[in-house]
């Protein structure tokens, strides 16, 4: 099976072997992202056709943790990027550095991001750098 995604910059085709699970990586960082993506993450994690991993940047740690607990979500990777008084550039840089390691380790077929946050930007950019298609919810 092949999934063809007409990308904004260039078209992308992902070839998938039907006998192997599709490797998906969902990236979250804020409470609204986790709230809206929780049902999707739970379904993908329970479906044997997918090998799903969840990475959080914890851009909004306390609020994110509340929602993760409420929906019983567990991150496979926690980048824990936040530091006192850091700029958006520093948040982006720390996210990209952490996501680079996760992308190398998990080698996803598709990356899922949500919304319009710094985490979303970093997740999509990291996937692009690794030539991995992005699905934006």
Q: Where in the sequence are the language-model features?
A:
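Aromatic-residue detector
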Residues: 14, 42, 54, 60-61, ...
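Active-site and donor-binding regions of nucleotide-sugar-utilizing enzymes
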Residues: 25-28, 33-43, 67, 81-137
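Conserved nucleotide-sugar phosphate-binding/catalytic loop shared by glycosyltransferases and other
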Residues: 48-94, 98
């Amino acid at each position: 099976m092949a999934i063809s995604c007409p990308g904004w910059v260039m078209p992308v085709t992902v070839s998938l072997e039907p006998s192997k699970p599709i490797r998906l990586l969902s990236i979250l960082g804020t409470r609204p992202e986790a709230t809206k993506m929780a049902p999707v993450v739970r379904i993908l994690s329970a479906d044997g056709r997918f090998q799903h991993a969840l990475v959080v940047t914890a851009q909004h740690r306390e609020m994110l943790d509340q929602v993760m607990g409420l929906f019983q979500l567990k991150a496979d990777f926690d980048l824990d990027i936040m530091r006192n008084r850091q700029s958006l550039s520093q948040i982006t840089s720390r996210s990209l550095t952490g996501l680079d390691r996760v992308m190398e380790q998990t080698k996803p077929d598709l990356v899922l991001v949500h919304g319009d946050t710094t985490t979303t930007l970093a997740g999509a950019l990291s996937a692009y750098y690794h030539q991995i298609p992005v699905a934006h919810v």
